[in-house]
Amino acid sequence: MKIAILSRDGTLYSCKRLLDAANKRGHVVEILDPLSCYMNISPAASSIHYKGRHLPHFDAVIPRIGSQMTFYGTAALRQFEMLGSYPLNESVAITRARDKLRSLQLLARQGIDLPMTGIAHSPDDTSDLIAMVGGAPLVVKLVEGTQGIGVVLAETRQAAESVIDAFRGLNAHILVQEYIEEAKGRDIRCLVVGNEVVAAIERQAKDGDFRSNLHRGGVARIADITEREREIAITAAQTLGLDIAGVDILRANRGPLVMEVNASPGLEGIEKTTGVDIAGKMISWIERHATPGYYLKTGG
């Protein structure tokens, strides 16, 4: 097959692993910067061009689209879909997952347990917003934040009010969430491929921090997950329409709670910790599901 990887940086670990895994299986792979793609949109002659050339048809596209380029990155992916390429995560699913409010609403409607969560833009009554999620301590997040950026633990009501007021001054959407103290700065990252959790790690925040993101200095070890956690991770990914997902779960006293579903999970930390060939499993999924011309038949 001919496969395109959409990424701004082909030197990243995840891209190199996917490239290597696909090449080992005999596929032809090209890494494309989605921001350098430009498109002709017309009923009879739609096409994609890249750095002065008309791109050929790709059997499959692997989107590795960063959060800051979601709009144009998914637009480029959508064009590939309309031209008949199979996407490893559809553009609509990526957009859905990147919208934190929308994704939480869909997960809640599906009956998936979440931390108590409130969202606001300019709350007239900060005290009521805080009370709505059970009071302090609580976590205040910028809806657009990623990798632990724009996330603050407010241990008292006064601190929570100050953080919310400060974030409100940024003209940003604010997400307020109960703090799961018993998690002790740990979470579980489940890597879902299709209808299977292929690997899972427990991430522990560094001393003095509650954010377990590996980008923030957290450490990881192999996680032994329960059948319930496995079911929740798969259901969360399927609820958002994702074939590939990193599902973050907190272990609370009342049971596992989904924190977030990542549509473009990094492979480095989880592959190096578990030794699982996740990139190979992703390519294998493409081989089993990339039906030629599927999106041409369905309209994308």
Curated annotation (Swiss-Prot):
Binding sites annotated in the UniProt record for Mn(2+) 2: 260, 262
Keyword Manganese in annotation: yes
GO molecular function, one term: ribosomal S6-glutamic acid ligase activity
Annotated Mg(2+) 1 binding sites: 248, 260
Needed cofactors: Mg(2+); Mn(2+)
Residues bound to Mg(2+) 2: 260, 262
GO CC list: cytoplasm
EC category name: ligase
Disulfide bridge partners, by residue number: none
Record domain ATP-grasp: where: 104-287
Cofactor binding, note field: Binds 2 magnesium or manganese ions per subunit.
InterPro entries named among the record's database cross-references: ATP-grasp, ATP-grasp_RimK-type, ATP_grasp_subdomain_1, RimK, Rimk_N, Rp_bS6_RimK/Lys_biosynth_LsyX
PANTHER family found in the cross-reference section: RIBOSOMAL PROTEIN BS6--L-GLUTAMATE LIGASE, RIBOSOMAL PROTEIN S6 MODIFICATION PROTEIN
HAMAP family listed in its UniProt record: RimK (MF_01552)
Record's protein name: Probable alpha-L-glutamate ligase
Biological source species: Enterobacter sp. (strain 638)
Classification lineage: Bacteria, Pseudomonadati, Pseudomonadota, Gammaproteobacteria, Enterobacterales
